[in-house]
Every structure is written in C-alpha cells, then in structure tokens.
C-alpha cells in the first residue's frame, strides 16, 4: 500500500513556521557571532540527541534552551534524557530512524567500545564518530561516610586497611562506576591502583547509573563511587558521604565527555553534522562564562533536564568545593571547563590515552592498532571546519591533534607517541 504524503498548508503549520522564524531571529540577536547556514544548508532540520543527567551535558541543554540548533538551521533537534549509559548505547545502536537516537552526550571511550563491538549485542560493531569534546574536569570520587576516619583524599592507600578489615569480616567491598571502560571506570581504577588497590582483585566493581548513585550509597550498596556532577555535590549536601578527590586533581585539564554521533548519520548529513556541532560549540562558549553559571544551574535543575535543586549544580560549577569531610575549597580552578584553552577540540592524543587505559584493563587487546582506531572515530577535521565557519579565532584552534605528554598526580607520564612505554610503567594492570 502506498504511503500518501500531503503537503497542504494548515493554520498550525503557518503558526509553527512563524514561531520558528521568530525564534531564529531572536537567537541571532542574542548570539551574533558565527555564520548561519554557511554554504549549503543542513540536509535535515532534525536529529535526536541523548543526554544523561550530568552537568557536562550542559552544552546540549543550553543549545536547546537558547535556540542555537534553530539558529544553525536545525530547529527540530530533540534532546532526550537517557536512563543510563547502557540505554544511551542501546538507543545509538537503534539509531534515530528506528526510534533510538542519532548522537549523544557520551563518555569519551564509549564510541570506541561501540565502534569495535566490545559492548554491543553479539559484538556487532556500530561505526561511531566523535565530533567534539564537551568538557574537561569536575567529576568526583566519593566515599561512604563510614570511611571518614581514614582521612582518604588523593592517596587511596589510606582505604586499604579498612577494605581488608571489611573483607575479613566476610563482607564485599564495592566500587561503583557508570559504565565498564567509560571515563568514571578509568578514573576510579587509576585512583585505586595508584594507591596499591587492585580494582579487579581487591574490590568488586559495579555499574550504577549516575542519577542513582546517591540513593545507592545511602542504603549501603557501595563503599566508593566515581561519577560526574551534580551527584557528588548532592551526596555531600545530603550528608551521606564525602568526596575524596575531584578528577581534575588526578589529571588537571583532563578530557571527559564527547559529542558522539553514529557515523552513518554524519556521512549522510555532513552539513547537518557541522550545523549541530556549531550550535554545541556556541553553547560551550556560553557555558564557559562564569557570569552564566547561576542561570545554567537553574536551567539544568529544571524537571525536564536534571530535576535537582540548582544548589546541587552551582557550587562545583564555580570551583567551590565542599568535600564533605571538613575540607572546603573556594574559588579553585577545578571547576568544569567547556571552551577556553581548546576544551571543545577533540585531541586525538586524549583518545589515545583512553584506549591505552582500556588496554591496561583488558577491554582491548595489547596489539590494538590505537592510531588506526583513533583516526577512524575521531573527526577533528569536522571540528576545524565548524570552528572556521563559526568565526573562531585562529589562535583558539589547536595547531596539532596532540596535546603532547600528560602528567598525572602520581608522577606517571603518558606520551601519546609511545603508549606502550606508559603501559610498561604501570604496576597494577591486566595487560601484560
């Protein structure tokens, strides 16, 4: 049976078109920088993007709230809440055309795990593309208040005796993260291992969706967890636990979430992919301004986004950290970064580290061709084209796809030109 498509003009259609035009005009006035539909316009006006209720999803939320997708010719973009990173993966596997999603606010390693079929049903590869990094820093490693007397902060070894005692009593020690092989998994593993605690032998790692972390610690389901904000802040505000360290203390200026898309969507809609990216980049610039933090906290706190009190978002967003163990730091540089200093640009060297760490913990084979994989997934070339069309100053566009050597809190150095040497320098690992 043929599908009949009618194109009659309705009053509702006229009103919708007029409303969209008015929105675009208003947004152009509020955000005068950048080009609108430079060259050929977007092939489509819609895309379905997923997000998890984490502060680093702010660029997608702000792009939607401020009409930036519409400004760049895509007024029908939908930003849809996902229940977990597993749900994000499953909906990306489906794709937008099958009632899933086309792209997402995503853990930076997850596109690689999907691209290679490591975390998909029947290990079926789902080609993925990284278009941008969404943020740096401001995740947290938090601990149940029963461990407050250990004085644990950056040095996780202070937990070793307490963990050993608990296990001797026949109890399980649980470390929670949000997705195997994701950023939170890698941060908590790095922190534990640096303190001499083997995350595969000395504790049990469990997966808990970000919005469920606080409730699960409240009922004693885990001893320590790693998650993004606002959940560490909420944990402290509710008096359930304390933050031992923020991830910026482990690796200052570390990459965190990415804007990931299905590769087939990007290939089919290259102009739309660039338009989406330009909207997100403008939103990142807005998010990065300290004067916008209170408004951003209020936006994110809305029911349709995070449904949390704005105060659970605001403090750490501004670099004010109440660790919950008597330690309070104000005006720190550990706040979440969204733009300045090349944050949005997806450095290939950063993806190289994520892959090296997942080799360390057995997610990828030691002989994985890291460079080939990064070149397949990381489309920093699209970011450069979008930046040019957006009018980003040449000085703000990184000259190289490598940020060079990275140094961690325990003195370890990662050279992206020699991941094997880095892996050889590590004591606790699965990879041999």
Where are these regions (language model features)?
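N-terminal secretory signal peptides
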Residues: 1-13, 20-28, 36
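Short, glycine-/small- and polar/acidic-enriched structural segments
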Residues: 38-207, 219-233, 240-253, 415-421
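Stable alpha-helical elements in mature extracytoplasmic
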Residues: 56, 65, 88, 184-187, ...
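Ligand-binding pocket segment of bilobal, Venus flytrap-like solute-binding proteins
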Residues: 101-102, 201-243, 262, 294, ...
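Short glycine- and hydrophobic/aromatic-rich loop-to-beta-strand nucleating segment
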Residues: 141-142, 258-261, 265-266
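Secondary-structure end/capping motifs
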Residues: 269-381
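Conserved C-terminal helix/tail region of periplasmic/extracytoplasmic solute-binding proteins
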Residues: 352-432
């Amino acid at each position: 049976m043929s599908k009949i498509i009618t194109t009659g003009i309705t009053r509702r259609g006229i009103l919708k078109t007029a409303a969209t035009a008015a929105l675009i005009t208003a947004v152009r006035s509020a955000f005068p920088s950048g080009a609108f539909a430079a060259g050929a316009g977007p092939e489509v006006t819609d895309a379905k993007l997923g997000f998890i209720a984490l502060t680093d999803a702010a660029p997608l939320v702000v792009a939607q709230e401020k009409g930036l997708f519409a400004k760049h010719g895509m007024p029908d973009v939908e930003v849809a809440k996902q229940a977990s990173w597993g749900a994000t993966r499953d909906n990306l596997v489906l794709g937008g055309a099958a009632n899933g999603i086309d792209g997402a606010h995503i853990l930076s390693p997850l596109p690689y795990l999907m691209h290679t079929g490591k975390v998909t049903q029947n290990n079926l590869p789902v080609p993925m593309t990284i278009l941008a990094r969404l943020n740096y820093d401001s995740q947290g490693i938090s601990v149940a208040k029963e461990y407050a007397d250990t004085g644990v902060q950056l040095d996780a070894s202070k937990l070793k005796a307490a963990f050993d005692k608990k296990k001797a009593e026949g109890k399980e020690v649980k470390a929670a993260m949000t997705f195997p092989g994701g950023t939170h998994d890698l941060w908590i593993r790095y922190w534990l291992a640096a303190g001499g605690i083997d995350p595969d032998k000395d504790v049990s790692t469990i997966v808990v969706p970000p919005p469920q972390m606080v409730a699960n610690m409240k009922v004693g389901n885990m001893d320590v967890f790693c998650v993004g904000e606002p959940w560490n802040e909420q944990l402290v505000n509710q008096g359930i636990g304390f933050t031992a360290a923020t991830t910026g203390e482990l690796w200052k200026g570390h990459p965190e979430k990415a804007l990931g898309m299905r590769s087939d969507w990007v290939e089919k809609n290259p102009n739309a992919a660039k338009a989406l990216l330009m909207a997100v980049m403008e939103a990142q610039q807005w998010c990065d301004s300290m004067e916008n933090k209170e408004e951003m906290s209020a936006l994110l706190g809305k029911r349709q986004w995070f449904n949390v009190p704005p105060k659970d978002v605001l403090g750490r967003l501004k670099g004010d950290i109440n660790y919950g163990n008597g330690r309070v730091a104000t005006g720190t540089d550990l706040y979440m970064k969204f733009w300045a200093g090349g944050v949005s640009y997806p450095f290939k060297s950063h993806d190289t580290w994520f892959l090296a760490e997942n080799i360390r913990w057995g997610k990828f084979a030691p002989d994985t061709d890291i460079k080939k994989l990064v070149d397949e997934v990381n489309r920093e070339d699209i970011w450069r084209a979008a930046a040019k069309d957006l009018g980003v100053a040449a000085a703000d566009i990184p000259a190289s796809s490598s940020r060079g050597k990275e140094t961690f809190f325990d003195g370890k150095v990662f050279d992206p030109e020699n991941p094997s040497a880095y892996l050889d320098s590590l004591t606790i690992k699965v990879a041999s």
